[in-house]
Amino acid sequence: MTTLAIDIGGTKLAAALIDKNLRISQRRELPTPGSKTPGALREALTALVEPLRTEAHQVAIASTGIIQEGMLLALNPHNLGGLLHFPLVQTLETITGLPTLAVNDAQAAAWAEYHALPDDIRDMVFITVSTGVGGGVVCDGKLLTGKGGLAGHLGHTLADPHGPVCGCGRVGCVEAIASGRGMAAAARDDLAGCDAKTLFIRAGEGHQQARQLVRQSAQVVARLVADVKVTTDCQCVVIGGSVGLAEGYLEQVRAFLMQEPAPYHVALSAARYRHDAGLLGAALLAQGDTL
């Protein structure tokens, strides 16, 4: 059975066909529309999947935000251009005429990455550091989603009570500081207006402010890793996302984690499936891997 998998992120939309052996083909990408209207997202999704829908038997969506009874509810609306509510499952079923499943993108990625780990790993946490910061928790071999779909939204745990206001309305969230959007918002002087990708380039060139912004992000994520270790007693933490997978970033997170007391230490690794983890995890769930 072929699955049309869709990944809805803060900066891009991706889609691909995935077969029962998790082989990916015909991968496509489009920018996430900046408009706040549901119509703009609907049009973008239609353009994204139209060339693929006739070859699929079902649709699986991994999306930023909270997925609740098929609705996309944004905890931080800034990550989707201000969109608050969107009938995600209904929209894709209308566009494709196919049965559709939707799950949070970090939860989906956690499920994919869990399947790539050795069989003796039953407890793991996935953290994505990208436009926002998200997470997924697997406990005793089961993916935790929560009754309201909120489980694993680790980016909205507290990093600094005196920090910047997060898009969710809370002050000092991990996401407000460590995410690509948070790093860009903190950039000043000659870096003002730069995106996270540019900040990493400038940091690599030795720019002191850029290096400090990257260090601050890595330190906040390391503290988050320590928190999830002591909360879940996970056997490992997998880091993904465009920031999380940037050159040298994981090494900085690991170095900061080693400064914490020993009980907070945990094995860290980069996402095996990298930017395809959300697509693959959603496909796994649609193909019968139960939550």
UniProtKB/Swiss-Prot annotation:
Gene3D superfamilies: 3.30.420.40. GO terms for molecular function: ATP binding; N-acylmannosamine kinase activity; zinc ion binding. Keywords: ATP-binding, Carbohydrate metabolism, Kinase, Metal-binding, Nucleotide-binding, Transferase, Zinc. It catalyses: an N-acyl-D-mannosamine + ATP = an N-acyl-D-mannosamine 6-phosphate + ADP + H(+). Pathway: Amino-sugar metabolism; N-acetylneuraminate degradation; D-fructose 6-phosphate from N-acetylneuraminate: step 2/5. Its EC number is 2.7.1.60. InterPro entries: ATPase_NBD (IPR043129), ManNAc_kinase_bac (IPR023945), ROK (IPR000600), ROK_cs (IPR049874). ATP binds at residues 5-12, 132-139. The keyword Kinase applies. GO terms for biological process: N-acetylneuraminate catabolic process. Zn(2+) binds at H156, C166, C168, C173. It holds the Pfam family ROK. Catalyzes the phosphorylation of N-acetylmannosamine (ManNAc) to ManNAc-6-P. HAMAP family: ManNAc_kinase (MF_01234). Belongs to the ROK (NagC/XylR) family. NanK subfamily. Homodimer. This is N-acetylmannosamine kinase. It comes from Salmonella arizonae (strain ATCC BAA-731 / CDC346-86 / RSK2980). The lineage of its organism: Bacteria, Pseudomonadati, Pseudomonadota, Gammaproteobacteria, Enterobacterales. The gene is nanK.
